[in-house]
Amino acid sequence: MKSTFLLLLLLLSLNLLFVFVSCASSIEFVYPNFTASNLRFVDSSKGAFLLSRNSIFKAGLFSPGGDDSSTGFYFSVVHVDSGSTIWSSNRDSPVSSSGTMNLTPQGISVIEDGKSQIPVWSTPVLASPVKSLRLTDAGNLLLLDHLNVSLWESFDFPTDSIVLGQRLKLGMFLSGSVSRSDFSTGDYKFLVGESDGLMQWRGQNYWKLRMHIRANVDSNFPVEYLTVTTSGLALMARNGTVVVVRVALPPSSDFRVAKMDSSGKFIVSRFSGKNLVTEFSGPMDSCQIPFVCGKLGLCNLDNASENQSCSCPDEMRMDAGKGVCVPVSQSLSLPVSCEARNISYLELGLGVSYFSTHFTDPVEHGLPLLACHDICSKNCSCLGVFYENTSRSCYLVKDSFGSLSLVKNSPENHDLIGYVKLSIRKTNAQPPGNNNRGGSSFPVIALVLLPCSGFFLLIALGLLWWRRCAVMRYSSIREKQVTRPGSFESGDLGSFHIPGLPQKFEFEELEQATENFKMQIGSGGFGSVYKGTLPDETLIAVKKITNHGLHGRQEFCTEIAIIGNIRHTNLVKLRGFCARGRQLLLVYEYMNHGSLEKTLFSGNGPVLEWQERFDIALGTARGLAYLHSGCDQKIIHCDVKPENILLHDHFQPKISDFGLSKLLNQEESSLFTTMRGTRGYLAPEWITNAAISEKADVYSYGMVLLELVSGRKNCSFRSRSNSVTEDNNQNHSSTTTTSTGLVYFPLYALDMHEQGRYMELADPRLEGRVTSQEAEKLVRIALCCVHEEPALRPTMAAVVGMFEGSIPLGNPRMESLNFLRFYGLRFAESSMVEGQNGESETMVFHRRESSNSGGSRQSASYIASQEVSGPR
């Protein structure tokens, strides 16, 4: 009996041990110095290492659809029963099955194991050390400190989905993936606007939540967030007490998820039994999806079956290789560059609609059709027009052309006619023949041409002989020069090994890719930039550097290897290089939205929304923080300005020209401020002989941030309100005046900060789509960045923390910002001189007395620094 009892006890212990071991691989908490990979946990829990307490959600490194043979893995949170991914971190940078997720006291990082220790994704700088990582019952990943206070949570950084209990706040968006097997950011997104939920394709609105037949508008209060509830979908206001727009769904406590699908639809699904059931989908008409039939594809909806069919408009055919509708005529083509000169327009006919005409205003009213065409012809980004006959309104289609929609039985849409912009190809027409009588002219022509041909042949032979002699003389000189050690021309790139060197291009390759450097898209102190296309149709930007200070190929390659090894989502990637003689060429990835300077200041395109500006500011700060503290070697950019902040898809900012200051020679470096046109962004220490540190970049970033807030250059014409307080025998009177003229915006921002009037600083084109608190946040960060003393400026890592809320906002120190008053005074004086010459108008502002206003220093070095840091 005793032995039987001991045997049962042993079996029970083994069973408990088995349960413990099997559950140990998936737990609710993990702690710092924890490393996970798909390979490590694939056998015990199919890649999961975190499991919520209710066992509804799991977290780990997974591949789309749970395919373990996939080459792309993502650190994700997944609904266990349905397999739905509700959040992923490294969606644009998948790792292999051996890639790791590392938890340290500094946060989470995802690393491609075996390739580099540079993370492909990481959490931002945190306010305090991490003590644990938790997966909640709602599917929220939390980083907790020693007091169990949340330092970071995945719900604040949604990807394409939100679930019960999660809030998608005003200005935040869900970005659909490229496809269901590719989690990379696609072209569609769902954005929470101030009055509605908006769906966008490549930044263009194409649908609103309240357009759905099941949507009910309950109030007109400004929207604060979108939420998924047990009873449906709702846009909420007034701290969650008022519903603005609601979509009622059957009450259920089951798992419910709202997702921006890769198909371009916004879908709400519920897990019922064993499957996900779609409860809501918008838009209901598939032909309202901008790219449902590809570029210029014509979508036709069958009302009976609710299925759409795709075709091409009349006089166009499908290019099967590219999936694009192109003209049938071989003499016509879609314009591929701004160089097209011979422009034609193909009429699409009546009843053909385009989504953007429902969401944008016409550029002009009361125009004849030819004038509408002329506007498009002069606009490089214009791809076509839609013309409304009754109102004679002109709508432009810019940047991207999506699918067309065939409209049936809708008289108001039959008034709109579309036209596609086309290029007329040049034909090599033969010159008209000579209509000779009797053929007697041939001997005459021969008698004239033969002596001339002989004469020119002798000249050509003489030139060839002279060139051969010149080449021989040049070769002998080159042989002497090449033998000198340290010469940039000497040595072959293969004679020494430098790890991390990017791809080397031949000069002829780049010459062909750029069509002999035909299309210049930029220029600056480092040289000109040209657009090019590689044989695989990858777009590139080629930068020519003609004056450099390097003395040998090995030194050049070492610097290029350092730049080429830098990988960050907010830094322009160096794809390769070419060295030919004294000429250096750098090959970068191409940014399709150009520079921030053109997007923000040109006024031609749509206005950057506040959330887009915030994202650009945050992304730029992250890129600079990585250069300053994330690289093996600290890199000071030295030239932070809107022209060097490029915008990729979805206006993702990428910093260019980093690391290039070492390639300048001493002569060009001494002309740094004038040659590169950056006066107004450079910190005062550039001229005062103080040490240059990464804080010089912080100053430049602060100036750029102020321009993001106002939407104009820091020195520009604008309206300004001035409050003046007068004291006459203890009778106080206050007046407010509004004047227009040249304004030095940093000084204006300082004045408005002291008075707490932040809304006067925001870009008026936003028309109130920004709150005072949002404007205050950016202005305070910017003013902290432009402190005169470098030691008082925050690091870029601290700036990122202030943006993300993990670090309290800094307080600008007035005593370190009084130099802006001196700059403003000098600017006003110079502007008045110009105004007297009839060149510009200036304005003098009343200034209220401030107790902390100190006298401006006017030493020689201080005034000299104004020439660099002051308004340009």
Curated annotation (Swiss-Prot):
InterPro entries: Bulb-type_lectin_dom, Bulb-type_lectin_dom_sf, Kinase-like_dom_sf, Prot_kinase_dom, Protein_kinase_ATP_BS, Ser/Thr_kinase_AS, SRK-like_kinase. Residues 1-26 form the signal peptide. GO terms for cellular component: plasma membrane. GO terms for molecular function: ATP binding; calmodulin binding; carbohydrate binding; protein serine kinase activity; protein serine/threonine kinase activity; ubiquitin protein ligase binding. It catalyses: L-seryl-[protein] + ATP = O-phospho-L-seryl-[protein] + ADP + H(+); L-threonyl-[protein] + ATP = O-phospho-L-threonyl-[protein] + ADP + H(+). Its main location: membrane. SUPFAM superfamilies: alpha-D-mannose-specific plant lectins (SSF51110), Protein kinase-like (PK-like) (SSF56112). Keywords: ATP-binding, Cell membrane, Disulfide bond, EGF-like domain, Glycoprotein, Kinase, Lectin, Membrane, Nucleotide-binding, Phosphoprotein, Receptor, Serine/threonine-protein kinase, Signal, Transferase, Transmembrane, Transmembrane helix. It holds the Pfam family B_lectin. Residues 603-620 are annotated as: CaM-binding. The chain crosses the membrane at residues 444-464. Residues 35-156 form the Bulb-type lectin domain. Its EC number is 2.7.11.1. It is found in: Cell membrane. The active site is at D639 (proton acceptor). Residues 851-861 have a biased composition (Low complexity). Belongs to the protein kinase superfamily. Ser/Thr protein kinase family. This is G-type lectin S-receptor-like serine/threonine-protein kinase At5g35370.
